[in-house]
Amino acid sequence: MEIKIATRKSPLALYQAEAVKQAIIDKHPDCICKLIPLDSEGDKDLRPIHELGGKGVFVKRLEEALVMGDADIAVHSLKDVPADLNNEFQIVATLERANPSDSIIFKESITLDQLEDKSIVATSSPRRAAQVKLFNPSLEVCPVRGNIHTRIKKLKDNEFDALVIATAALDRLQLNLENVEKIDSSVMLPAATQAIIGIEVGRDINPQKLEIIKSINHHETYFIASVERKIIKYLEGDCNSAIALICKKIKESTFEVNLRAFDHKSLKVEKIDMCFIEAELDQFYLELFNKIEDLKIKELISN
């Protein structure tokens, strides 16, 4: 059985595709897995994501490969996949979630607390930018695009003073950099599905191949991802929305959700922290969505 795996060409994307390939081979040694590296619009055009039409710019080219039969599956950083997925496609498996935190890289040996006023912190994420400004309003934020190595080079070339990057990306690429600080979740909460590798298929995938893909699914991560994606879908957030969200297991069958929503202009923030039992998921959604409406969070993030 051959499985063709569509992936973006960036070093991080190729690592993630290789991780999926290895997971398949470990469970199904007779499988032949072939990577299909592709250029996405978001990789070729380095304008701000909102000018390109939103997060989907990282997945459209891979979805085209699924439709055309050039690939059987597409591997993504799940946070790049729109929560309102086209009906032609579905996320059928995830690998185990890595560390979901963010890290900040400095040019010198300092900490986030020690960044001087007016220091420039690079990130193109409205979520990260809002939380940086809330932590220290005197800091300045500038946008940055390109793959991780490109962004780190810009830091070394003194284009800014610090750079915020997902911890999982640094870990996966084994970038043992100096002057790196993991940012505590009390300062910076991650994006929904951050650090989760997702596997997307078309609705007409070969049933045998589908079963192979489902066999590598990490069920707890998949459940957590589905919760986070459902909440993001309800919020109707887009690439300009400053939303931080994480669901995590705290004990058997019990989960906690932490939501932070920001108006990135005024820096007003609304917070929701709730726990739920897996068997009462529908009731949890009802209560959470009512709170979202009461706090007018949709209006807040659309400002």
Residue ranges and their predicted role:
Residues 1-40, 45, 51, 134-303:
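Small-molecule-sensing regulatory modules
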Residues 48-73:
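Short, structured active-site "lid" loops
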Residues 57, 64-65, 81, 86, ...:
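Extracytoplasmic loops/domains of multi-pass membrane proteins
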Residues 78-81, 168-170:
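Short glycine-rich anion-binding loops that position phosphate/pyrophosphate groups of nucleotides
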Residues 78-79, 87-138:
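A conserved helix-loop-strand patch within extracytoplasmic ligand-binding domains
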Residues 61-62, 111, 150-151:
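Short acidic active-site motifs
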Residues 67, 72-77, 161-166:
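Paired acidic/hydrophobic, glycine-rich loop segments that form the ligand-binding mouth/hinge
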